[in-house]
Design a protein with these regions (language model features):
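Short aromatic/hydrophobic contact patches that present stacked aromatics
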Residues: 3, 98, 132-134
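Conserved active-site alpha-helix within GNAT-family acetyltransferase domains
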Residues: 137-155
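A short, internal acetyl-CoA/4′-phosphopantetheine-binding micro-motif in the GNAT/acyltransferase core
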Residues: 83-84, 96-107, 136
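Conserved acetyl-CoA-binding loop-helix of GNAT-fold acetyltransferases
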Residues: 98-101, 107-121, 143-148
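GNAT-family acyltransferases
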Residues: 1-96, 158-167
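Conserved GNAT acetyl-CoA-binding A-motif
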Residues: 124-134
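Conserved beta-strand edge residues that scaffold enzyme active sites
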Residues: 136-137, 160
Length: 167
């Protein structure tokens, strides 16, 4: 069964293995935790992410962000970064959701099914009547994922498509 679970201490070992298997920056998905030690993950990253998800100790111009791992039964297959509030930078850029699927689980529909779960999770909690997402133009698979979830291309620049999903 496929489900989302927020970053937590109970699953720290599996979360650590998953998050460190995702590259630092691949296809526009930035993973600032790719090279941390397990101790740093448990003692620093998880507590910091918990606080920041509640809006505590945010850096200037930052919004609360939640990390949801996508699980298929007892295996983590991906990671979704979710922002329920947007600032101007996010509204014009990355948007509400960023996601990455662990390489060995790609091309199995996990991104589409995970994105649908995230949309369902946040649709009643965001201020906008659309979900904002961006995608690198050189990542057609991610664009296809978004289109499969009802997205349309709202805007574009040289490097990115900016999509919207009506809710």
């Amino acid at each position: 069964m496929l489900f989302l679970k927020e970053m937590n201490f109970e699953d720290a070992k599996k979360e650590y293995i998953a998050i460190t298997s995702i590259p630092k920056d691949e296809n526009g998905f930035e993973n600032k935790f790719y090279n941390v030690s397990f101790e740093e993950f448990v003692n620093g990253i998880i507590p910091t992410c918990e606080k920041q998800s509640k809006g505590i100790d945010l850096k200037p111009n930052r919004v609360p962000q939640n990390y949801y791992f996508l699980w298929d039964d007892d295996e983590i297959v991906g990671l979704f970064k979710v922002r329920k509030k947007l600032n101007d930078s996010l509204r014009e850029g990355a948007g509400h959701i960023g996601y990455g699927i662990i390489k060995k689980y790609r091309n199995r529909g996990y991104a589409t099914r995970g994105l649908k779960l995230v949309i369902e999770l946040i649709k009643d909690e965001i201020e906008e009547d659309e979900i904002y997402i961006s995608v690198n133009k050189d990542n057609p698979y991610s664009l296809k994922t978004q289109l499969n979830c009802g997205a349309y291309i709202f805007n574009e620049n040289e490097d990115h498509y900016f999509t919207r999903i009506k809710i």
